[in-house]
Each structure stands twice: as structure tokens, then as C-alpha cells.
């Protein structure tokens, strides 16, 4: 009877499938994403929204030095979750691809074309020895021909388009919020509030200075970073909404108990 190769053998090599058809190193890369900061992306009727909780762990860190949202082109922006160094490499590649498209074809690259190019790079790192997968997920969003696009890429190179989605450690909770609250007809302003509401459910305290947020509106088609002052106003509105929901829940519970 042929002896099975120990699991550790499949564990060490990126190019070898386990008997169950799994690539363990890709799964470990996904685990790096699951431990990363939470990012939320939302398509709205008049644009797109990205928001990330930067999860600052020390008072000594200069918050302005921690970037989680990156402008790729005038009309494309990306949010990252996972290994920071891997993010830097892929963001640089994405920017180069966008520049090359303008030089070669005289026009801006589409959001979908850019997302596919990044996924091709990720996928290649799951097939060749001497390298490891990127421990990184990306939300790539922008405006294409008057319509918003939002793509999620994972370490395997898989690409999925969403109306609203989340990546990182708070994904399960954030997705529950998005599935229950998302409306295709919401405006960018409403999308910003929903994004921060989703993030508030994934952390004990949502601090405005720790939030990185960007929007792109159909009207201007340009990436716009949101200031801390504006984020603070939205966070305040979010917590007022949360407080009202908690009071309503307590009231309903009291009525049920009295019955």
C-alpha cells in the first residue's frame, strides 16, 4: 500500500496540491488577510466609497504615516488588508500598469482591466517555486464610463465584483451589516455613513483619526480623500444612530418582558 505524504510536505511547497486539492500556502496567505485591518467598499448610485480602520496600536505612531487607501489613477483607488510590505509592491505595480496604459493607448485603464492585471500577478505567485503568495487582499474601485465598479481580489488571484463588500479581520461582521443595510439607490453621503457604521460594529471604539476614507463621484470622476474633520462628523452621526438602535432594542425587550 502506498504511503501518503505527510501534511507538512504539502505545507512547505507552494506548487504541490494536497490530496484534498488544497494549496496550503495560499490558505495561509488568506489567514494573513483575515488578521488584517478591516476595509469596506460600497458602490452608490452617484459614486463609490472606501473606508478602512487603520487600527493604530500605539500612541507613539504617527497616524499620517499609516496608509491603507491608495490612489492608483485619477479615477481608481484601492484599499488593502494584510501584509503592509506586500501592499506596497502591488500598489506600485498597479500604478505602473495604469501609466503604461495611458502611454500605450492614450487613454485611462478601466477598473476591471487593472484588477485583472493585479490578479494575474497574484495568481503567478501561486504557481512558481521559490516564491510565496501575496498575503494581501485588495478592494479596487473606480468609475468606468459613467458607472461605478468595485472588485475584491484575494491572495489566490481570484477576482469578484461586488455592490458592497469588506475584507480583513472584521469581514464577517461588516458583511452582515452591509447585507442588511445596503441599498443600490443610496448616495455617496449615505454610503460613507454606512461604511463607518459597518466599521463601528467591528471595533470597540471607532476613532476618526484612525479612519482612512476616500470617495469617487460620478460627476467629477476623481479620487477625493475625506478629511478627519468630516469623518468625525459622520462618526458622531453613526454613534447617535447606534445609541438610538440600542434604546429601541431595550424598549422592545422591556415590552416583551412585561407581556
Swiss-Prot record:
Keyword Phosphoprotein in annotation: no
Intracellular or extracellular location(s): Cytoplasm
Cited SMART domains: Proteasome_A_N (SM00948)
Cross-referenced Gene3D superfamilies: Glutamine Phosphoribosylpyrophosphate, subunit 1, domain 1 (3.60.20.10)
GO biological process, one term: ubiquitin-dependent protein catabolic process
A cellular-component GO term for this protein: proteasome core complex, alpha-subunit complex
Job description of the protein: Component of the proteasome core, a large protease complex with broad specificity involved in protein degradation.
HAMAP family: Proteasome_A_A
Subunit structure: The 20S proteasome core is composed of 14 alpha and 14 beta subunits that assemble into four stacked heptameric rings, resulting in a barrel-shaped structure. The two inner rings, each composed of seven catalytic beta subunits, are sandwiched by two outer rings, each composed of seven alpha subunits. The catalytic chamber with the active sites is on the inside of the barrel. Has a gated structure, the ends of the cylinder being occluded by the N-termini of the alpha-subunits. Is capped at one or both ends by the proteasome regulatory ATPase, PAN.
Family statement drawn from the similarity comment of this UniProt entry: Belongs to the peptidase T1A family.
Record-given protein name: Proteasome subunit alpha
Amino acid at each position: 500500500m502506498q504511503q501518503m505524504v505527510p501534511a507538512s510536505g504539502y505545507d512547505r511547497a507552494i506548487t504541490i496540491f494536497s490530496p484534498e486539492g488544497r494549496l496550503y500556502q495560499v490558505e495561509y496567505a488568506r489567514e494573513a488577510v483575515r488578521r488584517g485591518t478591516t476595509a469596506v467598499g460600497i458602490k452608490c448610485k452617484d459614486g463609490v466609497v472606501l473606508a478602512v480602520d487603520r487600527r493604530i496600536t500605539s500612541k507613539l505612531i504617527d497616524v499620517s504615516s499609516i496608509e491603507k487607501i491608495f490612489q492608483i489613477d485619477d479615477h481608481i483607488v484601492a484599499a488593502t488588508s494584510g501584509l503592509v510590505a506586500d501592499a506596497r509592491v502591488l500598489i506600485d505595480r498597479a500604478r505602473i500598469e495604469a501609466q503604461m496604459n495611458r502611454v500605450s493607448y492614450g487613454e485611462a485603464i478601466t477598473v476591471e482591466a487593472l484588477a485583472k492585471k493585479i490578479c494575474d500577478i497574484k495568481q503567478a505567485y501561486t504557481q512558481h517555486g521559490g516564491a510565496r503568495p501575496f498575503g494581501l487582499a485588495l478592494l479596487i474601485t473606480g468609475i468606468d464610463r459613467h458607472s461605478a465598479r468595485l472588485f475584491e481580489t484575494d491572495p489566490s488571484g481570484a477576482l469578484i465584483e461586488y455592490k458592497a463588500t469588506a475584507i480583513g479581520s472584521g469581514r464577517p461582521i461588516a458583511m452582515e451589516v452591509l447585507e442588511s443595510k445596503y441599498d443600490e439607490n443610496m448616495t455617496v453621503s449615505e454610503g460613507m455613513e454606512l461604511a463607518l457604521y459597518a466599521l463601528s460594529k467591528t471595533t470597540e471604539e471607532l476613532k476618526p483619526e484612525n479612519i482612512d476614507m476616500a470617495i469617487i463621484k460620478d460627476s467629477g470622476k476623481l479620487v477625493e480623500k475625506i478629511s478627519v474633520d468630516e469623518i468625525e462628523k459622520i462618526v458622531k452621526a453613526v454613534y447617535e444612530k447606534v445609541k438610538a438602535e440600542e434604546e429601541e432594542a431595550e424598549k422592545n425587550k422591556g415590552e416583551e418582558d412585561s407581556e
